[in-house]
C-alpha cells in the first residue's frame, strides 16, 4: 500500500509516488497513432493538466559550438574564442548563460577549449560532448572539465532500429557507461535523444530513476537533457505524452525525482515551436534551456539563444544584468567575419527589426514611438539608428 506523505513544496498530503519499472517489449512502440509518417503528425489531448512549477533560478545553456557547428562550416579556434567572449559578456555578472558545450575530438576543438578555459570565466562554464567510452571520459578529466554530455537515445526508433537492441539491453549499457563516467569523477549530463517519440513511463522515467540511484551512490550530480530531437514537442495544456512538454518535465521532476536544477530542455524548430517549448520547459520545472546563437543548428535549427534572453526577461521582470547590446554586436560579427546575414525579418537582429513602412504606423511613431514599438529597442540596437530615424 502506498504511504500518505507531506509534500514539502505544496504543504499538502499526497500519496507516495508510484514506482515506475522498465517495460521491456518485443516490438518497438513507434506511436504510429501520433506519427503515421505518411501523414502530418497528430496532436492528441487527454486533458490531464499538470501545474506550473517554474524554478526560482532559471538559466540558458549554449550549444553554438556543438549543434551550431553541425550545420555549417566549422568555426576557427579564434572565432570560437571571440564568440565565447561575447557569450560571457551577454550573460552578465550572474551568469544567466550558464554553460557552453564543446566537441573534444580534433586538436582544433581541444585548442579552442584550452583557450576558452584560459579566459578564467566562471560563466559560461566549459562543458563537453563525447562518445560514451572510458577513453573519452579520461580525455574530459585530463582537460580539466567537470561535466560532459553523453548521448542516450531513448525512443524505440533509436533503440530497435538504430542500435538493434532491446530496452533492457540498452538501459543496462547506458547505466554501465554512466557508472564508468562517475568512476572518473566526471558529472554526466545524459542527453535523452528523441524524447518526444519515447515511451515516457515505460522507458524514460524508469531509466531516470536508475540515474538518481547512481547519483545517490556516487554523490555526483547527474543531469538530464530532454532532447526534442525532431521538434515534435507541443506546449498545449492537456496534450498527450510523448509530445507534451509539460508532461515530460513533470514526469522527470515528480515521478523520476530529478531536481529542477538538473533538468534541461533542448529544442528543435521543425514545427516553429522551439521558443515556445523552451519557455514551457521553464514554466513546468526545468531550470535550463539549451540554445544556439541565432538558432543555427541541424535542419531547421535549435532554439535561438537571443530569443530566450528576452523570454527570461519577460518571465522574471528583469534582465538580471544581461547585456543585450551584445546581441547586435554578435549579429554584426557573424555577418562581417562569417558572412552569415540574418534573414531581414528575424526578431531582434534582422534588418527589418524595429522598422516600419506602413504609412499609418509611421505617422504613429512620429507622434509617439511607444505606439508601434515593442519596447525601447536601444537595449538591443546599440550603434544603430533609432526607430524614429528608420521610419
How does the language model describe each region?
Residues 73, 102-103, 126, 130, ...:
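Hydrophobic alpha-helical scaffolding
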